Amino acid sequence: MAAPEAWRARSCWFCEVAAATTMEATSREAAPAKSSASGPSAPPALFELCGRAVSAHMGVLESGVWALPGPILQSILPLLNIYYLERIEETALKKGLSTQAIWRRLWDELMKTRPSSLESVTCWRAKFMEAFFSHVLRGTIDVSSDRRLCDQRFSPLLHSSRHVRQLTICNMLQGATELVAEPNRRVLETLASSLHTLKFRHLLFSDVAAQQSLRQLLHQLIHHGAVSQVSLYSWPVPESALFILILTMSAGFWQPGPGGPPCRLCGEASRGRAPSRDEGSLLLGSRRPRRDAAERCAAALMASRRKSEAKQTARAAPATRVTRRSTQESLTAGGTDSKREPLPPATSHEAPGTKRPPSAPATTSSASASSSTSSSKRAPASSAPQPKPLKRFKRAAGKKGARTRQGCGAESEDLYDFVFIVAGEKEDGEEMEIGEVACGALDGSDPSCLGLPALEASQRFRSISTLELFTVPLSTEAALTLCHLLSSWVSLESLTLSYNGLGSNIFRLLDSLRALSVQAGCRLRALHLSDLFSPLPILELTRAIVRALPLLRVLSIRVDHPSQRDNPAVPGNAGPPSNVIGDEEIPENCLEQLEMGFPRGAQPAPLLCSVLKASGSLQQLSLDSATFASPQDFGLVLQTLKEYNLTLKRLSFHDMNLADCQSEVLFLLQNLTLQEITFSFCRLFEKRPAQFLPEMVAAMKGNSTLKGLRLPGNRLGNAGLLALADVFSEDSSSSLCQLDISSNCIKPDGLLEFAKRLERWGRGAFGHLRLFQNWLDQDAVTAREAIRRLRATCHVVSDSWDSSQAFADYVSTM
């Protein structure tokens, strides 16, 4: 009897509290109604009025509300602001209540954006709070504009920071200065433990103060935090100083900027122990060689440069203080100051402000980790102090008043702050000279021969495991820096380089990957490489990568246009270095997934077969736009797959003309090891469809291991669809459970007949059926009836596509 009594007591308490505030709330509701010319509005329901009163006094009533019975609490949840709604989550779950629908409605009403159809949202609370954090940080949302977002007892940034798993920094590094400000220390501490992915999009030129803030932010989030992935997107003209800063910090190197505050966490970690003479070398690995004269010279140059920058920073300090003060004032005005949040009741699991223990510097590096950045030219003293980043490194020769530094006596450049001179020379000639100077730098010679400052003076901490560069053109000095960092980046597990304009720098990349693969503890297992052009044909490049990284598990490579070596008639066509291309056999590797996107032109089948023969563990192969000289060459590839790749489960062909390879297609469909085959836009039924379709169906009926067949874009038509229905007949041993027939000129009457045949054979549910971009809008009633019947047999995925867009395709099939 105790439980019902407690329930009634809580209900009475709720009614008493609500009644005490009802008159005040009613007067506020009625006042505007009397003055309205349109007449009085309908009063809110009594329970809703009571709920509003309780939600407005949650600061006093929170513990009592948490103890309310489930039915009453369920009605109050939609009336709470986002802060109390987030805090009550655990209690609601214990009472069998879900807040997901409330968070979804908040997303629709406040964020006003629709998630991507490809995105599967598992937790709307986390998604909303993460987006809310980003909007508040950038100042793109006014928390005072909606009562559900505004509460003086909470800091929007601090309260939502624990849900942030992915943070995006855009344009002029907005948000970096705010996050490292002293009032937001607890916000940054929370981010250090919750944030996993850091993204940079559409970066623009930034000043020294913004870069200093970013340096502190990256140090806290990567070196002392949990960030494991850094991605850069769409940076058409990268600022070299900023790009190299992001790279070196991601690789685990840390050098406090000139005039910057010391790291509190580093001080706590080193407090209580005497500094070691060889501390720098220990941080870089026990097997690091001793510093030679050139490296000592480079370190001295860096120290000189930092002193000069410290003077500039001191002169710019007043302006910086004004900027930071105005930034903090704007944050305070927006309600984003880090006040101390009210502690939840004793039943809450929340413990805001819990300090993360500082991470100790990593000491597992087993080889030299010096960064390599090319030496830059100092601008004249009368030039503007702002850096002028360029797409390519320019020499200062011929520029009046410019000074060329040579040797150690000249003034140095810091690793993170380059000033470039625009010279009147041709870019190609300058790149060639830089390449001549840089030759051999990645083959074991001293990086100081490039004039690159050594990083031995830097401490090395925790580094990220995933690096992604999308549409970020790499200049020569940026590519050299990346390659030199990669050669000892043993913690890196996944590397993506997409449309970076590597050009001849691909050879330096191969050298660095080869050096990385021999390092003890190398973890690189996934490489994604795509570009417009490549100095190597794609198959030779694939062979070189597989030889350089024999432990690689996933390789995705795409080249959009053929290289010069694909056209021997091009004059001055020089071959690659001898250590990159060789005729020797490829050693056995660990590849499990290989994806290749080919440029136009016939590909040599023997080269592809050599890669497949060495990849005995291959489980997934995807060929995009591959062209072979003859069907026999394609058959040679398929025969190699059957003999050497016995573990292959998934095979995909996209945008390939297989109209003349019907016997090879039948050979694939009879393979009893494959579980999934994709023929996407392969023109399968362009020739002899009446003879080929029955042969194809017969091969599939006898294959009991094939689970998925994808045939989008092959002009199957109604006749082909009805022929495929025979795969599910009673005399078939097929176990097909996924079928994709998108973009196949299928009409509603054909789809309806297909559904009736499946019903007649009674095979039961066979899985998923995809029907995107077919001509189902020509008879909407028949299409709806067909889909209704199909849904009793399988899970149907379709869309409302306008078939008039496919007029040309329709004419071609008349």
Swiss-Prot record:
Residue ranges of LRR repeats: 489-509, 520-532, 533-557, 615-637, 638-661, 703-730, 733-754
Keyword Lipid metabolism: no
Official protein name in the record: Leucine-rich repeat-containing protein 41
Segments of skewed composition (Low complexity): 354-385
GO cellular component, one term: cytoplasm
Residue numbers bearing the Phosphoserine modification: 155, 276, 326, 375
Organism: Bos taurus (Bovine)
Domains (record comment): The elongin BC complex binding domain is also known as BC-box with the consensus [APST]-L-x(3)-C-x(3)-[AILV].
Gene name of the record: LRRC41
Bias kind Basic residues: ranges: 389-403
Phosphothreonine PTM sites in chain numbering: 327
Repeat in keyword set: yes
Keywords of this entry: Leucine-rich repeat, Phosphoprotein, Repeat, Ubl conjugation pathway
Quaternary structure, from the entry: Part of a E3 ubiquitin ligase complex with elongin BC complex (ELOB and ELOC), RBX1 and CUL5.
Region (Interaction with Elongin BC complex): 45-54
Residue segments, region Disordered: 265-408
